[in-house]
Amino acid sequence: MAKAKFERTKPHVNIGTIGHVDHGKTTLTAAITKVLAGKGQAEFKAFDQIDNAPEERERGITIATAHVEYETDKRHYAHVDCPGHADYVKNMITGAAQMDGAILVVSAADGPMPQTREHILLARQVGVPYIVVFLNKADMVDDEELLELVELEIRELLSSYDFPGDDIPIIKGSALKALEGDTGELGEQAIMKLMEAVDSYIPEPVRAIDKPFLMPVEDVFSISGRGTVATGRVERGIVKVGEEVEIVGMKATAKTTVTGVEMFRKLLDEGRAGDNIGALLRGVKREDIERGQVLAKPGSITPHTKFKAEAYILTKEEGGRHTPFFNGYRPQFYFRTTDVTGIVELAAGTEMVMPGDNVAVTVNLITPIAMDEGLRFAIREGGRTVGAGVVSSIIE
C-alpha cells in the first residue's frame, strides 16, 4: 500500500502514552495504529517497531522515543511512546515531546503502581494539561466489582494530583485483543471508544502564534542613524511595526516601540512565531538591552528569581556529573539564550542528588529572568550540560 498522504486540513494534536512498566503502553500504541489502519487513517506499526525506538538527543540527553502518527475523523495526531521509564522522565522534563494530553495506561489486573503515580506527578509538574485513562487487560478481571474498585482508585489518585479525577474518561479494554483483531467490546470497540474520548476530552491546543508575543534576545546591534536592533527567533505570537513591547529580565522592565521588523534583510510589517527577525527599537541604547532578556507583549510575562522545578540530572554516561550534589549546589541555569547562576535548595529530607535522578528542587537565581510555568531550562557547569528542568511553579 502506498503511503497515504496526511491531509493537513485537520487540527493537529500531540499526545502520548504514559503509565507503569508492562501495563501495556506500547501494545496500546500498536493497537491504535492497527484499528485506525483498518479505516485508512493510520499506517500499522507492530509492537517491535515501536519498542525498538531509535535514540534521539535532546539538549545533550539521550532519549529513546517512538513516534507514530494517525488520524481520526476529527483530528491528526502525533503520538509518542517510550520504551523505558527513564526515557519518559527525560522526555517529559526536557519537553522533547511536548504533550497536549496523555493516555494513562493502567493494568486492570494490577491497578495503579509506583510509576503510575510518578507519571501522573510528572504530568502535573511539567504541565501536561489533560489525561484520558485506558484501563487495559480488562479481560483478565472477571469480577465487575474489582474493576470498579480499580477505577475508583485511579480517579482518587488523579484527584490527589489536582487532575479532575471525577470527570476524566476511563475506557476499559484489552490492547492485546484489539491488536489480535478481536472486534468485540474489549477489543477494537474499546480502541474506537478511547479515540472518541481523546477527540472530545483533550481540547485543541492554543497554537504558538495565538499566544502573546515573546522573542528571546540573541544579539544586539547599533545601526547608525536608525537605532538599536535586537535579533532573535520569535517564540510565540506576532509583533507588528508600531506596537509597544516590554524588555523583560535581568534589569528593570522597560517599555519601547518596535519601529521596524526585518527578516533576511527585507523590511516586514510583522514578525510571527518561528521567524528569525531583527526588531528596531525606539529610544533604546545599545547598552540598555542584552542577550538573555526577552521582548514581550506588555504585561504578558514578568521577571522572577525564585521558583520550584522538576529536574533530571544526567548520568556519567550521558556526559553529566560523576558525583552527587548537595543542598546549596550552585550551577548555571540556561534559560532560552543565557546562563544565570542559581542556588539549589533540596526538599527537606533529601540529603543529596545522584546522577540519573529526577528531583523536585527550589532554585534561587542571582539575576531575574522572564519566566512562566512550563519554561524549560538546562543545568550547566562551565558550559557543559549536567541536567534539564522545567519550571513547575513560581515563588517570587
From Swiss-Prot:
GO terms for cellular component: cytosol. It is an enzyme of class 3 (hydrolase). Residues 136-139 are annotated as: G4. One of its GO terms (molecular function) is GTPase activity. Residues 60-64 are annotated as: G2. Residues 174-176 are annotated as: G5. Residues 10-206 form the tr-type G domain. Gene3D superfamilies: P-loop containing nucleotide triphosphate hydrolases, Translation factors. Residues 81-84 are annotated as: G3. Its EC number is 3.6.5.3. The keyword Protein transport does not apply. Pfam families: GTP_EFTU, GTP_EFTU_D2, GTP_EFTU_D3. It is found in: Cytoplasm. The keyword Iron does not apply. It catalyses: GTP + H2O = GDP + phosphate + H(+). This is Elongation factor Tu. The lineage of its organism: Bacteria, Pseudomonadati, Thermodesulfobacteriota, Desulfuromonadia, Geobacterales.
